[in-house]
């Protein structure tokens, strides 16, 4: 197995705890050997590696391969957490899409329910017309999860892996970063970013995926251990991250970060741009795959309100 992010990041720790739990419970049945993170296989190349059987398991944001499995954007735009979609059939639909389109078993959506915020070096400005964050002239780090939204905010985007963002902030190549509400201090980006723009948007789309040929070759006992622990981790990790949020917010405030809010009108427009851009991208990609009939189903399971 490999993981997208460095081991010190909270999300990687969740995955490594999952591995430990599987190895304990799966003694004599199934064991996971972790080969490393982005230093072993570059983070954006990991999904292809598990699809092609170079590795058996990857812990990664779904957005890194969202062009191939457009259903992933339903997790990004989700108003539900993993336990809910596991129960209502959303996860089964996500798994079927992964098996059909990407030759992987979708084992778990972990750390669900954590939102994203935009963090800036300089004091943020707001557009007078609609009250939305004005990113005109702002150089912002991009990755696939945010692209559509940042374009709608007219930002100047620089796609780069998170491992390069510290250096880019230090050199002034970028002066803003979107990231999950938690974890900025783990990455040490708080040395540069001093403003956190509210509200948060989206949900993390971190999943554990397994090469389908490898999965199909496993014994029923091995599959059961992997899946049972994964389902437990969906519930546990969501609760753990919700508890973490207050701790991180306190750490940000103690470090001098300022929290900047939209006006009521601006917030409504900001969130509409965020979510409309994701559903538009999902719809367009699903049409290209001949699956536009599934868009309404995904919306009902992941974002019913």
Task: Name what the model sees in each region.
Residues 1-84, 106-305:
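N-terminal secretory/targeting leader peptides
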Residues 81-101:
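A gly/proline- and charged-residue-enriched helix-loop-helix capping module
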């Amino acid at each position: 197995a490999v993981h997208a992010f460095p081991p010190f990041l909270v999300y990687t720790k969740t995955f490594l705890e999952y591995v430990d739990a599987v190895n304990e419970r799966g003694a004599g049945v199934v064991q996971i050997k972790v080969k490393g993170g982005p230093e072993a296989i570059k983070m954006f190349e990991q999904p292809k590696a598990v699809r092609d059987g170079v590795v058996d398991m990857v812990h990664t944001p779904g957005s890194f391969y969202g062009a191939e499995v457009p259903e992933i954007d339903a997790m990004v735009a989700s108003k539900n957490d993993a336990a809910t979609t596991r129960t209502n059939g959303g996860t089964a639909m996500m798994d079927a899409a992964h098996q059909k389109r990407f030759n992987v078993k979708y084992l778990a959506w972990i750390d669900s329910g954590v939102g994203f915020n935009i963090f800036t070096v300089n004091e943020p400005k707001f557009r007078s017309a609609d009250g939305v964050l004005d990113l005109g002239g702002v150089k912002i780090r991009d990755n696939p999860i945010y692209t559509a939204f940042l374009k709608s905010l007219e930002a100047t985007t620089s796609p780069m892996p998170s491992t390069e963002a510290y250096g880019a902030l230090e050199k002034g190549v970028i002066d803003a970063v979107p990231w999950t509400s938690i974890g900025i201090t783990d990455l040490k980006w708080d040395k540069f970013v001093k403003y956190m723009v509210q509200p948060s948007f989206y949900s993390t789309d971190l999943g554990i995926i397994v090469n389908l040929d490898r999965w199909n070759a496993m014994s029923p006992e091995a599959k059961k251990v992997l899946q049972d622990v994964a389902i437990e981790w969906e519930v546990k990790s969501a609760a753990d991250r919700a508890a973490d949020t207050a701790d991180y917010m306190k750490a940000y405030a103690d470090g001098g970060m300022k929290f900047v809010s939209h006006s009521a009108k601006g917030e409504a427009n900001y969130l509409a741009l965020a979510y409309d851009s994701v559903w538009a991208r999902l719809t367009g990609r699903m049409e290209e795959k001949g699956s536009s009939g599934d868009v309404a189903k995904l919306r009902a399971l992941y974002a019913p309100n």
